[in-house]
């Protein structure tokens, strides 16, 4: 009886607990801002004397429309911040759940992998060692990596090092798949060399309790040790020497030399081109008994994957690479849980898998758990976030962010939670399985692996020799395999948007799966953020383009909320992101009102002597104070707040605006969206985040079209405030009713302050100066605006 009672108590221990975060004061502040916005709208709509004062024209109506849009966006933000919560995880209780895992349970993923979660699990990779997004596939978590072309492939090869903590059972279900979309022999060579280095690196980490498993970070600083640590010092010196040798070998590697002298191991790369090559699948490390590291082994399989590419087939960028990796991992190890991380990220917390498992398995309706997302964090980042790309304040939701995410494979396969319950008994004959047979098409091995995932019973699945499944893996990674199937539509990562990660997460939510956010201390994964103006704005343009594509497509969240299982508040949360491009257009219209009124001697804001001026001033002060305190609460500095505030204006008038017009032109058939890779320039040695720039915190420019609208806006405001000041000083506006007041001048000055990097860029030199081609095109836009303004 006592034993039964103890067993029940052990099983009832919580794996996670949801702790609501009380934000009463914040809610009140939200309503204050909303009230002021509505008051401004009411005042503008009921201003009977507007025509008499000369302010009832187009500027007044445009201002009303823009301010109504701002109120709508504020409502979306209020929804996203309405009921925040954190999840406290208890990984120490996983052992108790493991003991119960041998009995039948409702969970579809508990029986196949929890043995693996008894010990710490760290998935570490050196950014230069793998070429892309990293996929882990184990009987618990799977890890998958989809590789970057060229620059982010070979350069990422040295720093992605596979790790390890010990695994007691089912070692063969732990695997790492690295995708190289560039099909580079140098990337493959780097992975092979990194795996060899891991034979000494992993035991060193175990012996000395090293928590930072990424060697480029660990060796960036000298360790602290005492007189009794002679053995550790010797080991550290030896490992540092071995790592330096590894770095030199990889950096000195040449593709031509490898192909000429590498022998049969590189034969498949001989005629391969980046955009035209056959599928290449190579097992770099097979975790069988003879390859085990140490007495208990635990080092994962390491598989290199370069999916087939052909000029006649659309390869769907990252989504296509992730789908190929999903199929390859399914026919080789078929883990029920998968972790994917980008090529520039490494694991920073060895306990991250345990915490993620607590969230995947810890809910009462755990069968509905779809994914756990770890918010992105960055290493070696510039002080005070000068380019506003860390998203520490706005990115706190439950969206799938494309990296650092633990997925249940069943959710990726496009089925709904209810279908698993229905098909639990006799899964091979259940409707859900028959449907999946149609979706997965020709590969019997892939359909058989899917049967185990859908049934939720992994105990009967044999553990295969992965080397014997290479040909099958090549078959499912061929470019013709997806023809006639539902891959990219209902199965796998979704196609149809440049932000395939957000679209995939939305589809998972619309099917009825739940998600959770995982935040650990230290941060679970660290990556590098783009630096400089071109990289930052290119990234935001790509995001906004993809998000706007979703908004105007059949994947609109409003439709999914009506016809599928997407909750209404989830729908509003997705809309918060999808309207980025529309915000760019609306905010530009509002920003153009200021120079327009200064140039045409009009007014669209209240005069200081009017009662409505208090509403406008209160709204400006309240909103900025709210935003400022929000940054302070996140532990950021005043400078970080200002940098993000000014970058919001710059991004809106450049990246978001171009995304808006890009998608519109694509919609009417005049253009096609082009996937642009974000360049992330980082140090190749010490990982301290510094590059070759004299001042990496300064804004840099190039001839990209993304700089044209902001440059034009900067020039226009300089011209407008100059003309407006001239008129005010020399009294040319005395007899003009409704002329610009202090509000227009202050708004113009505030906007120029936000655009200060572009003001400096107009007179800067080198990469710190705006190219003459951009200045010329911007000048033409300014001239056109002045011409149109004078005609009115």
From Swiss-Prot:
Any one Gene Ontology cellular component term annotated for this protein: plasma membrane
Entry keyword Membrane: yes
Biological processes, Gene Ontology terms: cell wall organization; cellulose biosynthetic process; plant-type primary cell wall biogenesis
The protein, known as: Putative cellulose synthase-like protein H3
Function: Thought to be a Golgi-localized beta-glycan synthase that polymerize the backbones of noncellulosic polysaccharides (hemicelluloses) of plant cell wall.
Broad enzyme group: transferase
Membrane topology summary: Multi-pass membrane protein
InterPro entries cross-referenced by the UniProt entry: Cellulose_synth, Nucleotide-diphossugar_trans
Compositional bias annotation for Gly residues: 140-151
Enzyme Commission designation: 2.4.1.-
Organism, scientific name: Oryza sativa subsp. japonica (Rice)
Region (Disordered): 132-154
TM spans (from-to): 25-45, 55-75, 579-599, 613-632, 650-670, 706-726, 739-759, 768-788
Family: Belongs to the glycosyltransferase 2 family. Plant cellulose synthase-like H subfamily.
Residue numbers annotated as active site: 181, 501
Chief localisation class: Golgi
Molecular-function GO terms, alphabetical: cellulose synthase (UDP-forming) activity; cellulose synthase activity
Localization (cell): Golgi apparatus membrane
Keywords tagged on the record: Cell wall biogenesis/degradation, Glycosyltransferase, Golgi apparatus, Membrane, Transferase, Transmembrane, Transmembrane helix
